[in-house]
Structure formats: C-alpha cells, structure tokens
Amino acid sequence: GIYGPNNAGKTCLIKCIRAIKRVLLNEKSGLMKNIFTDSDICELGVTFMQSGRKFSFDFKYDVRKEEYIYESFSEIFKDQYNNEREVCWLKKDCVNEIYQCMDEDVQVMIPIVSKNNLLCYLIDTSKFQYVHEMKQILIGFADKIDIINMNDIPMKHTIELMKNKNQLQHKVVEFIKNADLYMDNFEYVDMDKIQRDVGEDNDKPEEKVLDIPENIMDQIRLVSTYKGIHVPSMLFDSTGTKKIAAIASYVIEALEQGRILVVDELDSSIHFKLTRAIVAMFNNELNTGAQMIFTVHDINLMDCRRMFRKEQIWFVHKDEEGVYVYSLADFTAQQ
C-alpha cells in the first residue's frame, strides 16, 4: 500500500509503472524529462520476481535525443545466509562506453546498434540464448501488469468476462453480490429481459467513464437484480457499486491467474470495510502468485492488525527537491 496526501506524487508513481510496462512491451511510453533537475535523462528501473526467480532491469532514456543510453539486466541470487549477489546478463552504458552481455556475439554488436529502442527489440534475439530469454522474461513480466484508476475504470473488461458463463464469471458475480448486501444477482442478459424503457436522454450515469456511446448497449445489458426485479446497473446502481462491478473482473482475474494489479485511489467511493476486504484477498496465505499495488488516502487501513507487514506499507513525500518513496520498515520502534 502507498500512502500520502494529495499532490504528493502517488499517481506519478503509478505513471512510472505504466511507463515501464509500455517500454518493456515496445509501446509508446510517453517518457518525460526530470522536471526537478531539468535533466533530459529519464531514469527508471524495476526489481521483480518471475517464475520464482528474481531479476532487475534499469534503463535511462534521453528525451531530447530520443535514445536509450543505458540498459542493465541482472539476475539476483541469494545464498544460504540470505546474502544477495547479482549476475549481469546485459549492460549497455553508452555514456561511459561499457558494454557487457552473456552472449559474446551480442556484446560485440552493442556499440554499433541503434539506440532508438531497447536492445532486445533492435536485434533478432532468437539467435542469442541469453538475450532471447531476457526478452521473454521482460515481456512476460510486463504482460501480467494491469493498471487502473478507481475514478476512471473501463467497464469493458467486466462486460467481456460476464459474456462467458464459466468459473471466472461466477466468481466475479459472487464478488459483486458480496459487496452489495441488497443485490440478489448481477448478470449480462438479453435485451428482452430488461424491464425498463431506457430511451430517455436524461437517464444517463453521472460517471463520465461509464457513459460511452459505442458501448452503451453492452452496458445496459449488465443487469442487477433487487427483490426479483431486473434493472440496468448503469442507471440504477450507486457509484460505489458500479466501481465494484468494474474492478471485480480485474481482482478475480489477478487472483486466478497470478497477475499484478496496480490501483490508483483504491478507496475512492468505496466503503472502508470493502477496501480492506479487497486487500485481504491478496494479502493472505491462499494467494500464491497475485500482487496488488495500490494508493490510498485513508491511513486507517494501516491500522488493521495482521493485515500488513511493515515492508508492505510505503509513504510518498514531496519537497522542493523532489518526490521520495520510503517504507515503514525503514523506521525502528525508537524512531
């Protein structure tokens, strides 16, 4: 969990995660220069687990030249005493002209290859063992990340999941029903089952994110049932219930498939007990592969006994020099 006041930098941290994901998937990243130091160099990095192994990847991007001037990929090992050591698979430092790669043929190529993208997207990696495996690891990691904002969640993901009658869909429905004590059912139905004329122009949801003309019919077919009466969810349900319906598919999919769910402003329009319940689904012994990273304002969530370990609670602080992220584990009892 990431805590901090408004405008402290929590959302910027989420944007950094999104930028890293886009870079690793060879998508437009939107990287910007450092506004605090007025430097053209944007530096980002991530340490992550993939298939039970620990890796780190760092890169530097020159915004003005539009070049990746630094790349480093390492695997991190632990010995029996819990000491860590890094084994470098790839290092490309164009500024200091340091080039290393476990594939010797690639090491020779690095200085002469273009810098307008990551190295693994500039060469045919299938011909090189380690660089090819590195690319698969990075893509596999980035593909598992889902990033959503509670104030702007697309309902499309839940709609697509609700169309298929399977175990995943059943769990999504149960999740939504448990979140709303008065709801009997939640389903995706044929239009003839909806007992209301939805032709009035004024009957539109308040949330802009849910008022999407091209998907309007799909959204109307999402139906909530109260005391046996079917009503369109988008017109009758509360903002909180609609947000729960939108996030439900992401939560269940993450838990079932071991994905990484990143949520900005998790506590927006959702009751504290429900926020706590969502976090508890990820933070228990039954969850072996999924992870949720979230930002919140309500510090009461930190007060939940046995909910978090100290290293799972992070704070964001901003001053005139920059934004700092630090863990509760950095503090001792005396501090």
PLM features per residue range, with description:
Residues 1-65:
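Conserved P-loop NTP-binding catalytic core
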Residues 58-197:
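Electropositive, glycine-dotted interaction segments
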Residues 46-52, 74-79, 224-228, 318:
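Short acidic, glycine-rich loop/turn motifs
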Residues 271-276:
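Short alpha-helix of the ABC ATPase nucleotide-binding domain corresponding to the H-loop/switch region
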Residues 19-30, 255-256, 283-289:
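Post-Walker A helix-loop "phosphate-sensing" segment adjacent to the P-loop in P-loop NTPases
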Residues 257, 277-335:
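C-terminal lobe/lid and adjacent interdomain/linker elements of RecA-like ASCE P-loop ATPase modules
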Residues 2, 201-252, 260, 266-270:
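Conserved ABC ATPase signature
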Residues 54-56, 84-87, 230-232, 323:
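Short, mixed charged/polar active-site loops
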